[in-house]
């Protein structure tokens, strides 16, 4: 019961409820034995009654709501002083009780020795009294020791908790300082960046404003120049001023050039504005980052305040616990004082009783003296009684003196402990003050930084307002239509201001929170409640932080999405406005064109058409370039999206790593706990061993005392008295020594505490230095980690040394005991002779034993303290690990939040891209609708154009989709490569881990061996001792009882050693089990790696199949694009309004470019934000990695098997999910592409409905055949999959190989049947192709007939031109009559100009109204875009806006109709005024109708050609598909054969291995091959069996070699062999993949050869067409020259006849001379024309005739053809080589493939022969045509020579001198006039008009000649251009 009572009050954490758990509640008094009084018992029972009263929990709370005051600290000091005082008192009482116990034992021995001197009753009473006193002292000693230990544990726990709290505060302050410093550094960097960006923005703004102003000036200047030239052209068109055709062309060219310059300036201006916007967005981004850092600082401040609250609460809890302990200690002190008072009272009563007995004894002595004479024996008895009483009195006096000394020492120790506690409390106060100072300083720093940042933010807001004002001014200056955008930007700024107000509110809330913090700090007192509340609040705060971060990110994303939506709406509105402006401009151009068409001649139209063709070609090339640029930007976007996905994957990998690190930490913590438990067990065992040793020593001591008693019985009373004196001396000496040792122990404890305090001070100083020197923090941490590691190693070494020292000491003590036994035996032999020496030796030996015992106790205490320190260090490290785990969890949560934000961002990006695409598609559909409404008022040409636009857009979308798929496939290929690299890295890591584990296992094995050897040595020593004791027992040197005791001790030690041996055996078994588990894990990892490698190979195969499908689809697209380009070229040549449409399309493309640029800018912003987030994450990860390295260094010996398995499984799950998502995406993309293809097919079917029924049936048949081929291809794929599955079955079950080979043969037969079916299909396709060729030939015949009809119609047009010219003559004759009518017409024209100006004014008003309406629309759209929740309403409003736009469109159409009506009225008035104009208009209408008919016929012919080409192209694609299928079949066959060969090779290798008896450590290289499933594998429980080789069918196996089951080296060797076999498997797979790549390369080369041959055929056809055109042009020119020469000859003859008959003799000479001069000039001009024609055409006649250039041309053509023939031969040789290679590769394939290849070779040979024959025929035709041309030219030159001779004859006739003089003067004047005219013509006319002839004498002939010569010059110019182009193409 006394034990229960001491247990109740031994620990401070005791609760009153625990009393109910005890069964025995009866109290037994300590002092009840040997006492007759009952007052002590009553007091004890009262104390027990008070102890059973329960205390309320609320009674421990303090009423004060503040920190500790001075009074409370004094109380704490007193309390701790009391605790230490009690501890010291109990220690002193323990020593006193032990000394009193020794004294009582001695007294009992003395009493038993002097038993004869006492009365029997007195002897029994005295002996009973001493025994009771001894029992009481034993019980009191036990309880005092127990209570002392409990109080020491309680004080140690308090100190540990205080040190832990201090360490938490210090670590938190250091981490907070680091974070704050880092944030401030980043904020300073952002400040610098912002300053730089603002300066750059201001510089750029100034520069851009200057440049934009210059651009505006230049654009205004260019606009004025354009207006001037347009005015000139208008004056020319209205007849105000007449211009030549050359000046008109020059003016139009200048207008075109000026407009292009103006466009360039406008694009430069847009670039400047775009750069300004980018800079502004970057500034906003940096500002948002600064605001984020502000918010993070505020959050850190909140966290800091909360942590301080927590620490204050912990301090209050400790205070409450101290108060509880104080109360318990007060109760104990009261008990001790009461017991002390009771003891004093007892001793006083006992003293009185002794004094009474002394008086009685004196009386008895007097009576004895009186009766001395009577009896001597009675006197002796009385003397003995007197001696006894005297002895008792002396003992009582000694007890009284001893108690006095103890009380004095107790008081001195109390004073010392009070002083030490005062020092400790002062230091605690100083630390508390330092912490408060640090807190205030940090709060001040944070507030200062926040105020600085808020000031900087206000500056930024001012700068932002300035920038926005400047931008508003610029936008007002340049674009009035952007007012709505500025409003939106102002709204966004208002949102920012609202965010700022929210930040201010948050700061106010923070102040409120600070006020609440002070109130909360005063209120929180209870420890257990506060701990739970703190944990809950921490969790809530973490959740709130995550929620706040998510809300902030959501707000940012919403703002960005609103901004993007606004920009998108603005762009859409701009597009619509631009479209409307383009429509108005087009309408104006149409009006102008209609006005100019009335007055332009037919020649002008021809020139215009030629120029338009060039411009259209240039525009088409520019369009293609722009399309390529747009495609490149789309590819960049795809790459950015792929990068975002990769960053997402990287973030997933980081998350998995952190999870694995967390699991590692948890395992390390568990392992440390296990180690700690093992150390505790070892320490307990050591303590138990030491206790056993002490007991043995006590027993030895008791044995010696018994032996001494036997010796002392023979001594006399004097010797007894002397012994008593010596014993008392020894006791006093021992007491003094004990007190001295206790003082030294206390001194050592105080010194340890001082060392701890100095260490804490040093730690505080180190923290301060770390705060001042953050740069050296990493190095110091690394050093501290190294020191900690060294300390751990030292600690481990100390434990091992302690163990070794303890064993050594035990051995030494045992050897000492043996020596002492020998000495005792010698003393026993010489007991009679050397008794005094024996006694002194015994006393010395006893003293030495006691000194050794004290030393051992001292060492024990030191080691116990060292163990406590190690335990404290371990607990501190455990707390640090817990904190680190919490930090890691927080980081993990942060990374999860970042991942969520990244995924949200990526989803937003994808959503925006999809919205962008949908908006673009909607926009295109809307544009098509508008175009369809416009097409109602236009002709069939515009219908064709809209169809072309639709088709082009669809093709572009398809090209974009295919390119996106290509980019995705490239990304997948990169991912596969990365997976392979990662597998290699994992393999290397696995090898390293394996080596490390192997080393660890070998070290453990060696350690176990060492321990086993030590145990064996100890067992041997014990057996030696046993043998010695048995020998001594035989000799009879020791007594039986001693031998039995020794044997019992030795048996106990033997049992202990057996237990240790069993523990070692268990450890060994555990190690073997761990090796087995490790081996199983390694096997699982190998299986996982092999599965992953198989999956990667399957992925690669699927990727290759997808690439092939995409390549095929891309080839189809290219063929469609080529066909479409051909149609487009033919349509471009005939369309009128294409140039304006191209300009419109260019503007649309530029708008799309702007949209894409904006999207790219957004993506750049997102990418930069991601980079910033990545940088933050990388920094945090760097810190985490540093901490991880620390923990890894500390925990090198930890096993991570479970975590590796879990992480592998999770990675596999994530990989599977990722691959699943990829497969789903691929499926969705394929479905989308198939749907697009179906839509395209439907569109093509609608377009080709006009074709004949035969073509429809053919197309249906073609589609059916394609479907059959697709089904066939799918069946082949299905069979390929079944083959793969069968190959896997082959790998798993060896005996199914023959069945699978049989199935393969069956599949081969099926393939042969399919090939025959394919050949039938190919024949049918060839027949249909033959039919199509026939239809094509018929079509070409029809086209030739149409060309003939066109030629006839052109001749009719020429006749009409001549008629028009005749009417023009008649108009000139009636010129005088029409002058008055012209005056009237001019007046009418002026009125028309007025009406036109009115129309312009109406147009301007309309444009103003339109802009206003657009502004209204923009405002409405802005209102719609304010809220994201009203998306449905936006659609309705957009539809309303579209209806309003349609109404406006109808209004525009009505205005157009009004203008047309006005124009018709004006035309009617013109018809009334002039009948001649009516005739001209009628003739022009007839011409236009004929032109339209011709164009319609030409378009029909063109459509027929395009359909024929399309069918031809479809057949070609069919052939290509069939060839691809053949190639795939051949590859499948090859793969099957290779797989079979590989299996046979593997079988042979396995057979060889079996024969060579090397199958002990063999494992199949294929993990799924002949092995059991991973779930069926069994891991051995305790013993490890060797891996059995797979038993093959039909093979006799030898016996397995011997295998060491317990050797880990052999097991690791087995794992290494397995890895080598896996590497062989991987190399085999890589070889297969490289062979597949080579086959794909050969297939690509075959396709390239086919394309090259197609290009050759096209070039030859173009070459032949060129020669035909050249021959036709030459024949036409020769005929025209012949006609001209015949006219000249006729005119000269007629003139000569007139001169001979009609002229007078005086004037005849002059007229004759004039005509001769004119004829000579004509002849010279004809010669120049002929020379120009011969030089320009390059149609060279042979060298023997008149020109060398024709021969040069022929030579060049020959050389080109020879080069082409050489190229063709080389390509043919290359192709044949490749075919031979393919033939070698397909030797094992079917014979049909060879036949097809041979047939293709024959086709190519026939094509080559046909080309050669065609070339020879063309050369022969050219030679014949050149001979005919030469003949005609010789005839012409003969005629010219005859004319020359006639003129010279006329010149030779003599004239009179007067006539000659007059003639010479006339000739001089005539020549001067001609020279002036020539100079004027050279200056004004262009180069191609220098051949004009001005014949002034006869206007009729000169005008006709001029027109004819102009025609010839134009034709010559076109021929020149064609020849130059052909040269360029040939080069």
From Swiss-Prot:
Name the job this protein performs.
Component of the cytoskeleton-like structure which stabilizes the shape of the wall-less Mycoplasma. This cytoskeleton-like network of accessory proteins containing HMW proteins 1 to 5 allows the proper anchoring of cytadhesin proteins in the mycoplasmal membrane at the attachment organelle.
* Coiled-coil positions: 1626-1659, 1768-1846, 1903-1930
Which organism is this protein's natural source? Mycoplasmoides gallisepticum (strain R(low / passage 15 / clone 2))
Do you know which InterPro entries this protein is assigned to?
Answer: Cytadherence_Hmw2
Q: Keyword set for this entry?
A: Coiled coil, Cytadherence, Virulence
Q: What is this protein called?
A: Cytadherence high molecular weight protein 2
Task: Name the GO terms of the biological process aspect.
Answer: adhesion of symbiont to microvasculature
What residue stretch is flagged as signal peptide? none
Report the domain of life of the source organism.
Bacteria
């Amino acid at each position: 019961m006394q034990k229960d009572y001491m247990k109740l009050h031994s620990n401070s954490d005791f609760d009153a409820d625990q009393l109910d758990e005890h069964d025995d509640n009866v109290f037994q008094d300590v002092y009840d034995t040997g006492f007759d009084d009952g007052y002590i018992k009553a007091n004890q029972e009262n104390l027990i009654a008070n102890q059973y009263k329960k205390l309320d929990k609320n009674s421990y709370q303090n009423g004060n709501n503040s920190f500790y005051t001075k009074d409370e600290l004094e109380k704490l000091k007193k309390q701790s002083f009391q605790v230490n005082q009690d501890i010291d008192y109990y220690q002193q009482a323990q020593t006193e009780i032990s000394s009193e116990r020794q004294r009582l034992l001695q007294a009992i021995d003395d009493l038993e020795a002097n038993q004869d001197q006492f009365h029997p009753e007195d002897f029994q009473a005295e002996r009973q009294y001493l025994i009771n006193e001894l029992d009481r002292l034993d019980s009191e000693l036990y309880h005092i020791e127990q209570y002392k230990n409990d109080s020491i544990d309680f004080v140690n726990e308090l100190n540990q908790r205080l040190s832990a709290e201090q360490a938490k505060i210090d670590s938190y302050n250091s981490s907070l300082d680091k974070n704050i410093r880092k944030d401030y550094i980043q904020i300073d960097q952002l400040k610098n960046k912002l300053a730089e960006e603002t300066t750059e923005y201001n510089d750029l703004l100034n520069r851009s404003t200057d440049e934009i102003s210059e651009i505006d000036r230049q654009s205004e200047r260019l606009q004025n120049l354009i207006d001037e030239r347009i005015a000139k052209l208008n004056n020319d068109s209205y007849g105000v001023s007449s211009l030549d055709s050359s000046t008109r062309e020059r003016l139009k060219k200048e207008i075109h050039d000026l407009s292009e310059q103006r466009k360039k300036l406008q694009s430069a201006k847009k670039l400047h504005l775009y750069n300004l916007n980018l800079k502004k967005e970057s500034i906003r981004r940096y500002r948002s980052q600064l605001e984020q850092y502000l918010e993070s600082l505020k959050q850190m401040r909140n966290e800091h305040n909360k942590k301080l609250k927590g620490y204050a609460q912990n301090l209050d809890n400790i205070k409450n616990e101290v108060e509880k302990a104080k109360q318990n200690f007060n109760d104990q002190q009261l008990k001790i004082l009461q017991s002390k008072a009771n003891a004093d009272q007892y001793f006083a009563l006992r003293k009185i009783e002794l004094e009474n007995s002394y008086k009685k004894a004196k009386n008895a002595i007097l009576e004895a003296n009186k009766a001395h004479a009577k009896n001597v024996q009675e006197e002796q008895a009385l003397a003995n009684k007197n001696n006894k009483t005297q002895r008792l009195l002396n003992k009582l006096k000694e007890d009284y003196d001893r108690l006095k000394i103890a009380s004095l020492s107790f008081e001195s120790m109390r004073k010392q402990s009070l002083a030490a506690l005062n020092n400790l409390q002062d230091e605690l106060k100083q630390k508390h003050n330092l912490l408060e100072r640090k807190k205030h300083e940090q709060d001040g720093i944070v507030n200062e930084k926040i105020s600085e940042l808020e000031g900087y933010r206000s500056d930024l807001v001012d700068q932002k307002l300035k920038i926005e004002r400047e931008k508003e001014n610029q936008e007002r200056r340049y674009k009035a239509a952007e007012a709505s955008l500025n409003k939106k930007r102002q709204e966004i700024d208002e949102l920012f201001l609202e965010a700022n107000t929210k930040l201010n509110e948050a700061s106010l809330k923070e102040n409120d929170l600070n006020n609440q913090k002070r109130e909360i700090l005063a209120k929180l007192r209870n420890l257990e409640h506060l701990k739970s509340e703190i944990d809950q609040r921490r969790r809530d705060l973490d959740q709130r932080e995550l929620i706040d971060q998510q809300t902030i990110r959501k707000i940012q994303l919403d703002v960005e999405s609103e901004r993007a939506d606004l920009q998108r709406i603005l762009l859409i509105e701009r597009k619509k406005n631009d479209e409307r402006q383009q429509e108005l401009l087009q309408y104006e151009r149409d009006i102008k064109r209609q006005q100019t068409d009335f007055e332009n001649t037919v020649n002008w139209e021809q020139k215009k058409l030629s120029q338009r063709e060039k411009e259209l070609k240039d525009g088409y090339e520019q369009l293609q370039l722009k399309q390529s640029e747009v495609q490149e930007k789309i590819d960049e976007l795809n790459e950015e999206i792929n990068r975002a996905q990769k960053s997402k994957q990287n973030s997933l990998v980081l998350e998995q790593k952190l999870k694995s690190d967390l699991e590692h930490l948890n395992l390390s913590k568990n392992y440390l706990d296990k180690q700690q438990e093992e150390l505790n067990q070892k320490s307990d065992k050591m303590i138990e061993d030491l206790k056993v040793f002490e007991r043995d020593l006590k027993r030895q001591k008791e044995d010696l005392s018994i032996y001494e008693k036997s010796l002392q019985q023979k001594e006399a009373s004097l010797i007894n008295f002397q012994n008593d004196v010596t014993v008392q001396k020894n006791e006093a000496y021992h007491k003094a020594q004990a007190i001295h040792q206790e003082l030294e122990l206390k001194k050592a404890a105080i010194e340890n505490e001082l060392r701890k305090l100095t260490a804490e001070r040093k730690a505080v100083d180190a923290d301060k230095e770390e705060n001042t020197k953050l740069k050296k923090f990493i190095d110091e941490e690394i050093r501290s980690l190294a020191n900690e590691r060294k300390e751990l190693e030292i600690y481990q070494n100390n434990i091992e040394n302690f163990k070794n020292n303890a064993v050594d000491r035990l051995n030494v003590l045992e050897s000492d005991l043996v020596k002492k036994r020998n000495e005792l035996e010698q003393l026993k032999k010489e007991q009679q002779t050397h008794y005094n020496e024996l006694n002194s030796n015994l006393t010395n030996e006893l003293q030495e034993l006691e000194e050794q015992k004290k030393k051992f106790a001292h060492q024990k205490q030191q080691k116990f303290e060292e163990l406590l320190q190690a335990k404290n260090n371990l607990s501190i490290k455990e707390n640090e690990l817990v904190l680190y785990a919490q930090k890691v969890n927080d980081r993990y949560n942060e990374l999860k939040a970042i991942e969520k934000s990244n995924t949200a961002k990526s989803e937003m990006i994808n959503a925006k891209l999809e919205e962008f695409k949908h908006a673009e598609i909607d926009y295109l559909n809307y544009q098509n609708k508008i175009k369809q409404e416009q097409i109602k008022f236009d002709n069939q040409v515009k219908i064709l154009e809209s169809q072309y636009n639709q088709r082009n857009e669809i093709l572009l979308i398809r090209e974009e989709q295919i390119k996106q798929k290509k980019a995705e496939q490239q990304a997948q290929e990169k991912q596969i490569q990365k997976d392979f690299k990662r597998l290699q890295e994992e393999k290397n890591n696995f090898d390293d881990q394996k080596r490390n584990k192997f080393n660890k296992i070998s070290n453990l094995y060696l350690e176990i061996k060492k321990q086993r050897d030590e145990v064996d040595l100890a067992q041997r020593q014990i057996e030696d001792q046993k043998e010695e004791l048995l020998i001594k027992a035989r000799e009879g040197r020791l007594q039986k009882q001693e031998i039995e005791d020794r044997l019992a001790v030795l048996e106990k030690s033997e049992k202990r050693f057996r237990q240790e041996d069993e523990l070692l055996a268990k450890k060994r078994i555990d190690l073997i089990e761990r090796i087995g588990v490790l081996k199983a894990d390694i096997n699982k990892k190998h299986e996982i790696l092999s599965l992953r490698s198989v999956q990667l190979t399957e992925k690669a195969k699927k990727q290759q199949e997808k690439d092939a499908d995409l390549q095929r689809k891309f080839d189809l697209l290219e063929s469609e694009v080529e066909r479409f380009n051909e149609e487009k070229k033919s349509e471009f040549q005939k369309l009128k309004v294409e140039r304006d449409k191209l300009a419109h399309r260019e503007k649309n493309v530029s708008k799309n470019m702007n949209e894409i640029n904006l999207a790219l800018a957004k993506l750049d912003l997102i990418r930069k934000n991601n980079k910033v987030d990545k940088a933050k994450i990388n920094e945090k990860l760097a810190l985490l990695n540093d901490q991880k390295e620390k923990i890894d260094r500390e925990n090198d010996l930890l096993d991570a098997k479970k975590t590796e398995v879990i992480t592998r499984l999770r990675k596999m799950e994530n990989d599977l999910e990722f691959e699943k998502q990829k497969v789903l995406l691929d499926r969705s993309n394929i479905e989308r592409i198939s749907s697009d293809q179906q839509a395209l097919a439907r569109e093509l079917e609608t377009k080709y409905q006009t074709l004949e029924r035969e073509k429809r049936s053919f197309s249906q048949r073609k589609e059916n055949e394609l479907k059959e081929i697709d089904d066939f291809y799918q069946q082949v794929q299905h069979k390929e999959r079944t083959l793969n599955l069968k190959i896997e079955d082959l790998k798993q079950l060896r005996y199914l190989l023959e069945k699978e080979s049989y199935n393969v043969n069956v599949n081969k037969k099926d393939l042969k049947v399919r090939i025959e079916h394919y050949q039938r299909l190919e024949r049918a396709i060839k027949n249909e192709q033959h039919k199509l060729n026939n239809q094509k030939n018929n079509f070409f015949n029809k086209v030739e007939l149409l060309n003939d009809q066109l030629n006839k119609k052109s001749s009719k047009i020429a006749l009409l031109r001549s008629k028009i010219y005749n009417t023009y003559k008649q108009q000139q004759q009636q010129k005088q009559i029409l002058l008055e009518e012209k005056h009237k017409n001019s007046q009418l024209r002026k009125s028309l100009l007025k009406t036109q100006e009115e129309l312009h004014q109406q147009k301007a008003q309309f444009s103003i109204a339109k802009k206003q309406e657009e502004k209204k629309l923009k405002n409405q759209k802005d209102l719609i875009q304010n809220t994201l929740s009203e998306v449905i309403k936006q659609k309705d409003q957009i539809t309303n806006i579209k209806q309003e736009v349609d109404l406006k469109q109808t209004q525009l159409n009505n205005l157009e109709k009004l203008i047309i009506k006005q124009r018709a009225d004006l035309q009617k008035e013109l018809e009334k005024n002039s009948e001649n104009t009516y005739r001209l208009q009628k003739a022009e209408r007839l011409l236009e109708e004929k032109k339209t008919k011709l164009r319609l016929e030409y378009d029909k012919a063109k459509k027929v050609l395009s359909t024929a080409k399309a069918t031809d192209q479809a057949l070609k694609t069919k052939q290509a598909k069939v060839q691809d299928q053949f190639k795939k079949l051949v590859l499948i066959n090859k793969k099957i054969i290779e797989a079979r060969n590989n299996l046979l090779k593997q079988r042979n290798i396995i057979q060889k291995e079996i024969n060579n008896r090397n199958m002990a450590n063999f494992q199949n290289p294929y993990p799924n091959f002949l092995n059991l499933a991973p779930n069926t594998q069994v891991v051995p429980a305790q013993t490890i069996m060797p891996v059995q080789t797979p038993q093959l069918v039909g093979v006799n196996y030898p016996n397995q070699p011997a295998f060491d089951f317990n050797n880990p080296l052999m097991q690791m060797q087995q794992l290494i062999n397995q890895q080598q076999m896996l590497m062989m498997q991987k190399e085999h797979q890589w070889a297969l993949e490289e062979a597949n790549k080579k086959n794909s390369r050969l297939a690509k080369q075959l396709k390239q050869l086919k394309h090259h041959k197609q290009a050759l055929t096209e070039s030859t056809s173009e070459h032949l067409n060129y020669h035909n055109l050249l021959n036709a042009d030459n024949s036409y020119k020769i005929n025209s020259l012949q006609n001209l020469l015949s006219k000249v000859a006729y005119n000269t003859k007629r003139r000569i006849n007139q001169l001979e008959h009609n002229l007078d003799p005086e004037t005849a000479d002059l007229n004759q001379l004039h005509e001769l001069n004119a004829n000579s000039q004509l002849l010279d001009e004809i010669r120049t024309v002929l020379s120009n024609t011969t030089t320009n055409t390059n149609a060279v006649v042979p060298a023997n005739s008149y020109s060398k250039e024709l021969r040069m041309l022929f030579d060049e053509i020959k050389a080109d053809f020879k080069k082409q023939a050489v190229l063709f031969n080389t390509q043919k040789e290359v192709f044949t080589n490749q075919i031979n290679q393919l033939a070698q590769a397909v030797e094992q394939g079917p014979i049909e493939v060879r036949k097809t290849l041979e047939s293709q070779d024959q086709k190519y040979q026939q094509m080559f022969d046909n080309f050669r024959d065609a070339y020879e025929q063309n050369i022969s035709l050219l030679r014949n045509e050149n001979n005919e041309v030469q003949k005609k030219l010789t005839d012409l030159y003969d005629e010219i020579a005859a004319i020359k001779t006639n003129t010279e004859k006329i010149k030779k006739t003599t004239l009179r001198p007067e006539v000659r003089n007059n003639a010479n003067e006339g000739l001089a004047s005539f020549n001067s006039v001609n020279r002036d005219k020539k100079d004027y013509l050279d200056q004004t006319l262009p180069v191609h008009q220098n051949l004009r002839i001005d014949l002034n004498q006869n206007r009729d002939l000169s005008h006709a000649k001029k027109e004819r010569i102009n025609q010839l010059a134009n034709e010559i110019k076109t021929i020149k251009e064609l020849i130059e182009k052909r040269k360029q193409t040939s080069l």
